[in-house]
């Protein structure tokens, strides 16, 4: 074809300079250093550190496991939607982060489903605003869960309906009753992932 290429062509690391600093920058990312702190530590310009952050995070986004095996735990996490940087807010501003105007789970919160197996393979899916539904679970979980997996969740009705329709073994742990562990069934791995 007459074109030149190398192993990095077509990847997020293509055409980046200072290859000797990449591992040190990855360590800065893992240590949750700010862009300016990383730039100061590596002696590069802050714009370079900012561009690198986006390139490295693109790599992390594509590095996901293909399938969960064995015992898989699933739980949902609700976060307030951030409109930081938006020129036109769709709601009144929340000063200093704040809290939702409505109590409980509402359309102000984004639902994130986290599924994790006992080997540590973790997948997360943004399902939308408001309460979790079985339709949202059907959209994200079937491609990444084996048919012979045991799905362990809390008592949410959407998981029960999804597992029944998908033909997946399901066991619910009744957290409201104070039962956190039933033999090998618990959702502590995925809840620990939430707390990070």
Residue map of PLM features:
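Residue-level recognition of single "structural anchor" positions
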Residues: 1-196
């Amino acid at each position: 074809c007459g074109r030149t290429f190398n192993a990095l062509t077509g990847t997020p690391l293509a055409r980046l300079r200072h290859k000797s600093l990449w591992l040190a920058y990855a360590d800065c990312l893992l240590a949750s250093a700010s862009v300016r702190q990383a730039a100061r530590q590596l002696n590069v310009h802050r714009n370079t550190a900012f561009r690198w952050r986006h390139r490295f995070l693109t790599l992390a986004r594509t590095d996901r496991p293909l399938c969960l095996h064995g015992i898989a735990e699933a739980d949902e996490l609700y976060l307030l939607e951030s409109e930081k940087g938006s020129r036109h807010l769709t709601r009144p501003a929340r000063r200093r982060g704040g809290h939702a105007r409505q109590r409980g789970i509402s359309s102000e919160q984004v639902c994130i489903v986290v599924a994790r197996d006992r080997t540590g393979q973790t997948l997360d899916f943004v399902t939308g605003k408001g309460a979790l539904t079985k339709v949202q679970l059907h959209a994200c979980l079937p491609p990444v869960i084996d048919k012979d997996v045991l799905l362990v969740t809390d008592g949410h009705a959407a998981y029960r309906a999804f597992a029944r329709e998908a033909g997946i073994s399901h066991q619910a742990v009744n957290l409201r009753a104070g039962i956190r562990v039933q033999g090998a069934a618990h959702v502590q791995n995925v809840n620990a992932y939430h707390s990070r």
